[in-house]
Amino acid sequence: MIGILGGMGTQAGLDFCNKLAVLNRGKIDQEYPLFLLYNKSNIPGRPESIGSQTKNLSNKSTNKNSKIKYERVLRSLLKGCKLLEKNKCRFIVIPCNTAHYWYDDLQKKINIPIINMPKEVFKFTKKNCKKNSKVGLLATEGTLKTGVYNNFFDEEYNLLKPSDDRPQCGFVRAPDQPR
C-alpha cells in the first residue's frame, strides 16, 4: 500500500491521489492501487519554519528560534509518517515540495522509504534533458527558500528560478493559489 502524507496544501494531496488513480487506471475497482491518504492539515507552516538565514540543508538551524520551529514541523511530519508506517504502507509520498526540506531527518527516523520528490524530478530531467540545459523551476517562496532542488540540479543543470533581483509577484504565488 502507498502512504500519502498530505495536508500541506490539501489540494496538492488530493490532486496527487487523482493522478495516481488516473495513471494506474484499472478495468475494475480491484485493479486500482491501494493507498492511504493522511490529510494532516495541522502541520505547522513550513515556510515560516525555515530560518531566514538558512540557505541549504546543511545549515538548518541557524538560531534558536529557527531550530524550535524546524523541530516543531519535523515532529508533526514524523507523526504523520509513523502513522502511515504503522498502517503497513510500503513507502511514503509527500506531495509538498517544501516539506522535502525535512526529508533527511524524516527518513532517518522511519523504517520505510520516503520518495524524494526533488530527486525524482532530477532523475526525470536527467533522462529527458541534456546536461547543462536550462531548466525552469516554478515553485512557492517556501520551496525556493529551502533550496531542495538546488541540491540536485546545481552541478549538472542551469536551474532558472526567481531571485531577489527579479520581480516574483504572480510567478511565485501562482502554485499557492486555489484552482
Tell me the role of every PLM-derived stretch.
Residues 1-179:
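Non-catalytic structural scaffold of enzyme domains
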